Amino acid sequence: MTIAVGRVRQERGWFDIVDDWLKRDRFVFIGWSGLLLFPCAYLALGGWLTGTTFVTSWYTHGLASSYLEGCNFLTVAVSTPADSMGHSLLLLWGPEAQGDFTRWCQIGGLWTFVALHGALGLIGFMLRQFEIARLVGVRPYNAIAFSAPIAVFVSVFLIYPLGQSSWFFAPSFGVAGIFRFLLFFQGFHNWTLNPFHMMGVAGVLGGALLCAIHGATVENTLFQDGEAASTFRAFEPTQSEETYSMVTANRYWSQIFGIAFSNKRWLHFFMLFVPVTGLWMSSIGVVGLALNLRAYDFISQEVRAAEDPEFETFYTKNILLNEGIRAWMAPQDQPHERFEFPEEVLPRGNAL
């Protein structure tokens, strides 16, 4: 009698076959994340190129916004839907467009198309970094870092307009359109005086400063190879020894600041932490603006400036500037509301 001991070979199902094909070693890795990333990124980019080339914003904003109408790269945009569309997804087959592609473009359907596919594409790219990190056997901090720009995109383009009356108040997808949105944020929300914006600026600029300092310090402390320390030729990717001196770098900054990083892991984590945290904080701030939460208000200065013509601070001047932005932008940006402001309500500085 013969007894065979071992594991029963399981039948390979369709999932295993697809998994093998998706994770096959190729020039451009696909993976499961690619099923989300590649179609969504293709559709978002294609929708943006189509909109900026051919589609007008006349029916939604009363503006020209395409190359076909004479705009250039800095002034083209895929603009937000009309205010009257509310928060409709504006599906091509929905009640607004009723399957008419031309009408769908006219009412702003391309914006929701680009925004939603763009968000899913960014999420797919983050999942791609998770997937490849798992396959290669490294930690997933790249994906964690990429969550910061995703948070900014989702909060600005999706959550903020969801808190307002319609998609109309989101940024349009274009350079000048984004600039207009920044002015809108300042005028209607006093965004620059928001503490979450301050943390975002500190994170982004602080990250840039850390990057510049770190790169310069490494270049300063390269080990000599032969006659000199060569920036581009000396390093071999497979070499076992260090290519720069952490001890020398630590001594250098200790003499300048009196304090320096002595641990490479902590140093690089800090370079990750500063910009990522800053972007996350600014995203939280935008969610607050979606709920119309206010920034810092210094009411005592406003009251005194109103009572005393000779008293003015940079804060009160900025408040007047914000009022001017609102008074100018509301009629220009929302012509359908038919705003009319008499001269006496328009803001004037105390110097006037």
Curated annotation (Swiss-Prot):
It catalyses: 2 a plastoquinone + 4 hnu + 2 H2O = 2 a plastoquinol + O2. Keywords: Chlorophyll, Chromophore, Electron transport, Iron, Magnesium, Membrane, Metal-binding, Oxidoreductase, Photosynthesis, Photosystem II, Thylakoid, Transmembrane, Transmembrane helix, Transport. It is found in: Cellular thylakoid membrane. Its main location: membrane. Its EC number is 1.10.3.9. The chain crosses the membrane at residues 40-60, 124-140, 152-165, 207-227, 278-294. Signal peptide: none annotated. Pheophytin a binds at residues 129, 142. One of its GO terms (biological process) is photosynthetic electron transport in photosystem II. The D1/D2 heterodimer binds P680, chlorophylls that are the primary electron donor of PSII, and subsequent electron acceptors. It shares a non-heme iron and each subunit binds pheophytin, quinone, additional chlorophylls, carotenoids and lipids. There is also a Cl(-1) ion associated with D1 and D2, which is required for oxygen evolution. The PSII complex binds additional chlorophylls, carotenoids and specific lipids. One of its GO terms (cellular component) is photosystem II. PROSITE patterns: REACTION_CENTER. InterPro entries: D1/D2 (IPR055266), Photo_II_D1/D2_sf (IPR036854), Photo_RC_L/M (IPR000484), Photo_RC_L/M_CS (IPR055265), PSII_PsbD/D2 (IPR005868). Chlorophyll a ChlzD2 binds at residue 117. It is a multi-pass membrane protein. GO terms for molecular function: chlorophyll binding; electron transporter, transferring electrons within the cyclic electron transport pathway of photosynthesis activity; iron ion binding; oxygen evolving activity. A plastoquinone binds at residues 214, 261. Chlorophyll a PD2 binds at residue 197. It comes from the Bacteria. Fe cation binds at residues 214, 268. Belongs to the reaction center PufL/M/PsbA/D family. HAMAP family: PSII_PsbD_D2. 2 of the reaction center chlorophylls (ChlD1 and ChlD2) are entirely coordinated by water. PSII is composed of 1 copy each of membrane proteins PsbA, PsbB, PsbC, PsbD, PsbE, PsbF, PsbH, PsbI, PsbJ, PsbK, PsbL, PsbM, PsbT, PsbX, PsbY, PsbZ, Psb30/Ycf12, peripheral proteins PsbO, CyanoQ (PsbQ), PsbU, PsbV and a large number of cofactors. It forms dimeric complexes. PANTHER family: PHOTOSYSTEM II D2 PROTEIN, PHOTOSYSTEM II PROTEIN D1. This is Photosystem II D2 protein. It comes from Synechococcus sp. (strain JA-2-3B'a(2-13)) (Cyanobacteria bacterium Yellowstone B-Prime).
